[in-house]
Every structure is written in C-alpha cells, then in structure tokens.
C-alpha cells in the first residue's frame, strides 16, 4: 500500500463529509455546464467523479487526444469550489479499439465474442487492451496531475470482467506455472487422476470452458483466483502510472460489495481509499439490512478507517426487473446508514439523468424534470444534513465483533458438485448477521487471516475452504480467551478444494469438540430443540455429529427423523475461550439463541435498553448513536438515556418515536456512563 497520508483525510479536512455524484458533462451541451455548477452548489455537492465513460471522446481515433472539453470542465468545477475525482475511462473502450483489435474483446465460456455497443467490452488479459489503457491513463495523469480541481483518482469502473479466450489461456498457464512450478504439481493440485484429466503439456491447460458435464472444481477455483488477480493487476498498472505524476492524491477504484468476481480483501490492500457502490432495493424490506452488512464489509476492508460510498441511487435504478423508486425520506436514511458505519462521504450515480443510452431511466440528482422536484429537494436537504454532521468526518468506526468472510471459500463452496446448491454463502452470512444488526451491535467483516485478538466475538457463518494456517489462527484466538461461532459445512476443504479424509470439520474438529460422518441435505424440515424447548426447524441442511471431547456439551439437538437426539449445536471450551459449532441451517429464533449465548459468554452488552423494532437500525460513530427507521410507520425506540439530536438540536428522553423513514443522531453519554448503562442490560431486556 501507499503511505497512510493517501486517504480521505486529505479531502475531508477541508470539506467535512464528502457529498457528490458521477458527473458526465459529455452527455450535455457545453451551455449546460455552468448551470450544472450552480445546481451542485445549491445541493451542497463538494466532489464529483468525472470521465468514467469518456474514452471515445478523449481518444476519438487511436493516438489522437481531445482534452479541450475536459480542460474546460475541470476549470469550471474548480472555479465553482467543486473537487474532482478524476477517472481513467478504461472500463468502456471505444469502438475503434474492438474493431481494429478484436483480441481486446472478451470471449465467454461458450467461445462467443462479446462485442462493443455496451460497456465493459474488454479482455483483462489482452496485451493490446492493456497497452491502450496505459496510454490513455498516462495522457490523463501527465496533463491533470497538479490541476487544482483534482483531489482523487478513480481507476476504471467496477472491475469484474472475465474472458476465456486463447490469450487468457496463455496468461492462465503463466499464473499456474508461478503457483505450482511443474505439471506434476498442477496435476496433484487439481486431482486430475479423476476422470482421466491428467495434463502432459502446459499447452493442454485451458480456462474452464463449456464442457459436456461438470468441470473440475479445482480448475474452476484457480481460474476464479487468476481472474481476480488479473483484474487487480489492471488496477495496479493504472495506479502506478498515475503515481508517477501525482504522488499526493489518493487513488482508488469502485468496489461492488459482495461481488463474486474479485477478491476485495486483495483489492483493499492496494487502494488508498476503500470506495464502494451500494444500491438499496426499495422493493425489498430487508434490503437495508444487507446494505448494513455491505457497509460493515467496507468497515472491515478499510480496517476501521473511513471509507467512501462512491455510488448509490437517489431513487429508482434501471437494471432490476421492476424498478421501484425510493419513498420520500429513503434517500436520506440510506445515506445516514453508510455514514453511521464509517463512510466519510456519499455519492450518487449520476448528477443529471440521461436522455439517451441504456441507463436513461436511472434516477439522478437532477431528474429530467429539473431542480423543482422531490428528488433534488431531498438531495439538497441531505447536503445540509451532512454539513451538520461534518464533525464525524475522520472518526474511526471499529467493532468488538467480527464476521469472517473469504472469497476463496465462497468460490469453492458454491461449486455445482456439492451436496446442495441451496446452502448459499451469502444467505448464511446474512442469517448470522441478522441478530447482531437487530441488537444494534457493531460488526466488522474481516478475512480469516485478520488479527482477531481485538475482537471479543468472532462468527464464521460459512468457511467451506479453510487452510490449516487459518484454522491454527482460530485455535490460538479461542485458547487466548476468544469466542468463536462456526456455521455448517465449514472446514470441509483445503486450499485446492480437496476434501480431507476422516471426520469433518477436519482442521477444526478438535477445537470445536465435535466431528461428523455424514452431511444430510434435508428432504423434509427437521425440528431443533434447546433442552426441552422447540426452536423451529432446519429446512435445508443437517449434519450427523458426535461429541469428541469431554469439555464439549450439546446446546441443541435435532427433534425428529433419522437424526433424532443427535447434536445440532455444540459448545466447547478450549483454553480460556469458548466455541460453538452449528450443524444445521438454524431458523432465526434458534440462531438468535446461539448468538445470545455467545454474546453473554464474550461479555458483550447490548447497546440499547430494549430490542429494536424490526425495521429500525442503530449504529454508533464518533460518540453519536444513529437511529434509523427504514419503515413507513412510526417506530418506538428505547435507547435508555436522554439526549439531544445533532441534526435538529431537539431533546429526546429515554424512550422516543422515530417518524416514518426518519432518523435521529443522538449524542451518547460519556464512555464510562454508557459502559455502566450497557453492563446492566441483560438478554431478557435488550
């Protein structure tokens, strides 16, 4: 990584919280641009991303540069007090590149070329594409490094392309050679003795193209790793060019939360600022919860330092099957959710709604109907709110609870040859996150290799693939006094996706005090019982488990079918810590009981005096508690102390009412007073 001085602090020290949008002036006549600046100022916008999709305008023919329009735009923005996140336009190559050099175009697993006429039409392994991308990036960096408007750089856009062409096959072989050194090493890692798949020459090795039946899962896993590395190398190449000309401004690229196509833990180590896209689905009442989880991933990716919500929607999008607009007030509370969970800025796609192109129906800061609209008024009101909250800029956002997540494990777990395709990783992640979110507890989503010592409780909802190194780290964490909850179908495979011989969960069996002999995808739901109290049913998954340690105890058992009386949840003590293994897809009530037991054992108090209503979110940052109502109904909340709302100055008692789609930002009591309040709260009252 580059020095920590390359961070959002260089922007927020001057502007407070960042507020902005993607600005695409090339879609509009130049006469519109001064009016755009006026509207930005009226809305309180202080940062815009420029140039994301402008390659064809910047380089209309190979080697020809057209910078006049961009010179004027940057000068206008600077004169208007608007800072710029200048993008390299390499996400959408011009038609001439694909026409003259078809090898730059991606090829799908069926061998079909994906043509220009859309966006993202590039092959990450194409040498010609990389050459052209480097050339336009260097031209931009050389010309605009030091321009007073440019405060940050944005590489490409939503890097996620994949190709299966011959040039990619060559690059894949090089990646495999560096990983395994020899064909013998590759054949062992891929288990090619199965189905007569052994390779006798590197020229025979291909990406996992369309095949008659299931493709080798180890080959597929390595290709996903390779593709992620190729995308990261694209980012690095452009970043390093920019750095030659601008050593001061932060460089980033926009991530997409839980996007399956790239390992964002690897990306986060290379970016100066973690920047993420998040688009709430107004039609889904639980979308805000997944949004919170995504923000907590950003909190983990950034190590608790501020991050940036670089894309979101003011209202409806255009790419879902049914694009419901946001209700009045939703724009504001969605932004607050990100700020509460560590974001130092909120930006929208895009500034002006397009009249043409594939995203013409996507909402924007300025709708086609103009400034005298609900959406623009709400944006301007949010701009004022963010100025009121400017004291939160730069404040850290850390947690005592970690949720473990690993892209390698995700890729491996959802191979089509597993016992079920219904036990999806993100579903498991959300299920374990839900009781923490509903209690207002702060969470960081981190990699299994993270320093876990700063967390009192660690949840691992799904770690299908777990290396011995990471398993040893979890063991050391528990023995040292940590508390660990492990979800089903974990510690099943090694780094190559090979299953371990013996009883599962393999490298965690001794730590967890339990092992199993058979996975049991369920033909019918089976009950889960805590003591004598039924707690719902597992519907997808169960495991045939047995205790293997005198320190292990059965917390819950199965209540029916062939697994009647067998352990469903096991708790074990190892050293100074405790672990829980969950051998089923527990229903919400049962999982809530397991998490509550772990919280109590870890000494983590509930932050509020009473449980939160279902559609209310609570999160703390910078000594302030954000209370956010994601429903269209008033909601009663009981923080347990009297306080003042930072947004309005209004006083509130120990119990309060949140208006529909409303929010409060309450000053929290002094740390010791707050700690005393929390320590008196029990599970029954929280």
Regions inferred by a protein language model and the residue ranges of each:
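The substrate-binding groove and active-site-proximal loops of carbohydrate-active enzymes
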Residues: 18-29, 51-68, 115-134, 156-163, ...
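Short, well-ordered coil/turn segments that N-cap beta-strands
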Residues: 15-17, 44-46, 78-84, 146-151, ...
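Aromatic-lined substrate-binding rim segments of carbohydrate-active enzymes
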Residues: 35-42, 49-113, 141, 238-245, ...
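Polysaccharide-binding and catalytic clefts of secreted carbohydrate-active enzymes
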Residues: 110-273, 277-293
